[in-house]
Swiss-Prot record:
This is Flagellar protein FliT. Dual-function protein that regulates the transcription of class 2 flagellar operons and that also acts as an export chaperone for the filament-capping protein FliD. As a transcriptional regulator, acts as an anti-FlhDC factor; it directly binds FlhC, thus inhibiting the binding of the FlhC/FlhD complex to class 2 promoters, resulting in decreased expression of class 2 flagellar operons. As a chaperone, effects FliD transition to the membrane by preventing its premature polymerization, and by directing it to the export apparatus. One of its GO terms (biological process) is bacterial-type flagellum organization. Gene3D superfamilies: Flagellar protein flit. Pfam families: FliT. Keywords: Bacterial flagellum biogenesis, Chaperone, Cytoplasm, Repressor, Transcription, Transcription regulation. Homodimer. Interacts with FliD and FlhC. NCBIfam families: PRK10548.1 (NF007836). Residues 59-97 are annotated as: FliD binding. GO terms for cellular component: cytosol. The gene is fliT.
Length: 120
């Protein structure tokens, strides 16, 4: 296999992995997405050290199309991850409020309160 086809094969793999990661995020499969992240970073590193040989304009053009796809997927993925982070932040805030309520009412358990006594 020559250098051009090896480089292009890596770009195809990156594009396919990018599509898979986007699909996982859209399906809410966050743990699986994180597992794929390691392979994604590794593949990007391999691509960065595998330049296209001179005179491979056609292959470079094909790689450019795949790069645009990967970049678009990354932008969409970033938006989905931000939405997930916001959702988790809200859940954590809600859990904190629930904990405060439980602590407050836990201190009052077993006590009979009459109107006006709670402020004393």
């Amino acid at each position: 296999m020559n250098d051009s086809s090896l480089s292009l094969k890596k770009w195809h793999a990156l594009s396919a992995l990018s599509n898979t990661m986007l699909s996982l995020a859209q399906s809410g499969k966050w743990d699986e997405l994180i597992e794929q992240e390691v392979a994604y970073v590794s593949l990007v590193e391999k691509i960065s050290i595998t330049p296209f040989p001179p005179g491979s304009k056609h292959i470079q053009d094909q790689a450019m199309v795949m790069l645009n796809n990967v970049l678009q997927n990354e932008m969409t993925l970033k938006t989905l991850l931000q939405e997930r982070m916001d959702e988790l932040h809200g859940l954590m805030a809600q859990t904190g409020k629930q904990k405060n309520v439980n602590i407050t009412y836990g201190r009052l358990s077993g006590n009979v309160l009459f109107p006006g006594e709670i402020n004393q």
